[in-house]
Each structure stands twice: as C-alpha cells, then as structure tokens.
Amino acid sequence: WGFSSARGVATIVETILEWIDVLVVTEFLGAAAGGIYGAVNRCVRVGTMIEHTGRVVTGPSISAALATRQLDRARDIFLSTTRVLTALSWPFYLSLAFFGPTLLGFFGKGFEAGAGILWVICPAAMLSMSAGGVQSVLLMSGKSRWQLLNKLSSLVVAVTLNFTLVPVWGLYGAVTAWASALLIDTFLASYQVFRLVGIRASAREMAPSLFLGAAVPTVCALASLAFLGQSVLGVIVYVVLLVPVYGAVLYRFRKALGIERFLSARRAKS
C-alpha cells in the first residue's frame, strides 16, 4: 500500500506539473499567450513518449535484476536504455528547436511567437533524457516515496518560479520555471540512482549517443535552413535528409549505442 499510494500521489503531482505553467500564463498574460504556450507544452511533451516506452520495455527486466541483487545486470540494462533514449530523443528536441517557427505555425497564425522558448526547454529536456530511465529504476527498486518527494520538490520550484517570473519575463519566465522544475526532478532522481542505488552511466559510455544524437540532426538542420530557410519545404527536406542518414548511423553503431541490448530486453520481456 505504501508503494502504490506514493506512486499514485506522484502521478497526480506530475499532472499538476504539466498544466500549472499553462494556467499561470493564461491568468497573467491572457488566453492568446496561454494558447501559444500550451502548443509549445504539448509539442515538447510528445518527447516523453520515448521515455515512457523505455520504462515499459525495460522496467520488468530491471526489477528482476534488482530483486535478485544482480546489480551489474541492472546497470547494463540501464546503460543501454539511457543510450537509446538519448539517441532517439535528442534529434526530436533539436528538430523542434531548429524548426520551431514553422512547426508552431501549423497551429495557426501567431503561434510562431512561441518558437524562442523552445531553445530554453528543449536543451533542458535533452539533459533530462540523457540521465536515462532513472525514474524507472527508482520505481523498480521500490523507492516510490523518493520519487514522490522529488516530484513535490519539483512542484514547489515550478509554482514559486511561475508566480515570480511570469509577470516579469512573460513566456520566458514560464519556460524557465518549467525547465528548472524538470532539471531539479532529474538531478534528484539521478543522485538517488547513482549514489544510493548504485547504478550509473559514465560520460565515456554515453559519448557515442550524445555526439551522434546532437551532431547528425544539427548538421542536417543547418544544411536545410541554409538553403531553404524556415519553411514547410525546409522541414520536409530536413526529414528526408535526416531519416536515412541517421537511420544508417544508428544501424552502423547499434552495438555502441546499446540498441541491440535494448531490443534483446524487449524480446526477453515478451
């Protein structure tokens, strides 16, 4: 009951964190600003689907390893998951940041005004993803109360900064609060997993995912923007360029990126 109740409350807190900044922006800056910020919010949170997928795929394997005190196996699964999360999520967030004006323009006229704040939240989301499935490790190791305390700390930061910064900085105040809350949660969970649970990934082990996940999308985006600028055609060319190139890179370095181990964990689960 203690585990389930803490997890249930943490889920409620997560939901509040998703909407608190949108509500504050709407209250202080009006419905139009709230709509723009809400569009950015929804776009960025699509990336969390990658993390949730990783949690579902590898969670049971990590739980089994921890239950049998196979810390090395749990670490191997965590490392491969972290590499894959980084390799898949970083291109998504970089795409949002580089082509924010065009992508937000699909929501309607004026929404491109929110493109600038993507350069605040997307790097924060990338850092959070590079920490890997720390939330999953906390849950699978039975530390749901730790996770709840992390979420509550994040909520305090979000509420405090939103009410302090939104009246002064507008949308940038809200996104600063969001990024700060996200990084606080990530830092606390990472510290607990690295220091207290004993599972961590080194910078050397993460280097291939970090480099390739940043370099390939950036080069493709800059090439498209240089020739076509911010346009729908530019986005199309970027996607047509990125998908085969990055797909080939992922396949070529599938072992170094942990993709094979990640897929083997999925097969073991099924």
Regions found by a protein language model. Give the residues of each.
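Membrane-interface junctions at transmembrane-helix termini in multi-pass inner-membrane proteins
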Residues: 122-153, 193-195
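Helix-terminus/linker motif at the lipid-water interface of multi-pass membrane proteins
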Residues: 15-46, 64-65, 101-110, 168
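Interfacial segments at transmembrane-helix termini and the short loops linking adjacent helices
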Residues: 79, 96-126, 132
